[in-house]
């Protein structure tokens, strides 16, 4: 497995820096999930991953999990930092508000990764992938 040195003062990184690494982390998790599910054709992989990692999907995942009171107080603070970060660029393919919420989601992923909160990161990603692929939370699947 890849091992990374701890980044000094990762708690102090701005929301966009957290989102930068969070975007990459989420992409790896989603791609791994799709390969594990047996998808191997590049076009299928691209289409399916795009449905989960798009700004719109990430914003929907965030809203869903917030409505479930999924996040801790500390995580909500990170989400707020990510949401309020100003990138200075115009988002492609989505509106500014959706982009800010997806940035918040990615910032939290980046924060959990950099703080080495691996269990919580895995839990969040599992919920996100489940919602992104079916629109339902994992524990609701049984009902």
Swiss-Prot record:
GO cellular component, one term: cytoplasm
Record bears the keyword Hydrolase: yes
Keyword Ribosomal protein: no
Subcellular location: Cytoplasm
Main location: cytoplasm
One BP term from GO: rRNA processing
GO molecular function: ribonuclease III activity; RNA nuclease activity; rRNA binding
Entry EC no(s): 3.1.26.-
Pfam families attached to this UniProt entry: Ribonuclease_3
Gene null: resulting phenotype: Cells accumulate precursors and mature forms of 23S rRNA with alternative 5' and 3' ends. Defects are more marked during exponential growth.
Record-linked InterPro entries: Mini3_fam, RNase_III_dom, RNase_III_sf
Residues at the active site: 23
The entry's keywords: Cytoplasm, Endonuclease, Hydrolase, Magnesium, Nuclease, Ribosome biogenesis, RNA-binding, rRNA processing, rRNA-binding
Enzyme class: hydrolase
Summary of the function given for this chain in its UniProt record: Involved in correct processing of both the 5' and 3' ends of 23S rRNA precursor. Processes 30S rRNA precursor transcript even in absence of ribonuclease 3 (Rnc); Rnc processes 30S rRNA into smaller rRNA precursors. Cleaves more efficiently on assembled 50S ribosomal subunits. Cleavage is strongly stimulated by ribosomal protein L3 (RplC); 20-30% DMSO can replace RplC, suggesting RplC may alter rRNA conformation.
Assembly: Homodimer.
PANTHER family to which the protein is assigned, alphabetical: MINI-RIBONUCLEASE 3
Family: Belongs to the MrnC RNase family.
Name of the protein in question: Mini-ribonuclease 3
Source organism of this protein record: Bacillus subtilis (strain 168)
């Amino acid at each position: 497995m890849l091992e990374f040195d701890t980044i000094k003062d990762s708690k102090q990184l701005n929301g966009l820096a957290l989102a930068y690494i969070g975007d990459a982390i989420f992409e790896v998790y989603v791609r791994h999930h799709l390969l594990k599910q047996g998808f191997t054709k590049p076009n299928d992989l691209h289409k399916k991953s795009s449905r989960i990692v798009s700004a719109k999907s990430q914003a929907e995942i965030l809203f869903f999990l917030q409505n479930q009171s999924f996040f801790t107080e500390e995580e909500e603070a990170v989400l707020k930092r990510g949401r309020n970060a100003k990138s200075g660029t115009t988002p492609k393919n989505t509106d500014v508000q959706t982009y800010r919420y997806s940035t918040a989601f990615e910032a939290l992923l980046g924060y959990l990764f950099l703080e080495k909160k691996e269990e919580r990161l895995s839990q969040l990603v599992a919920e996100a992938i489940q919602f992104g692929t079916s629109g339902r939370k994992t524990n609701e699947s049984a009902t």
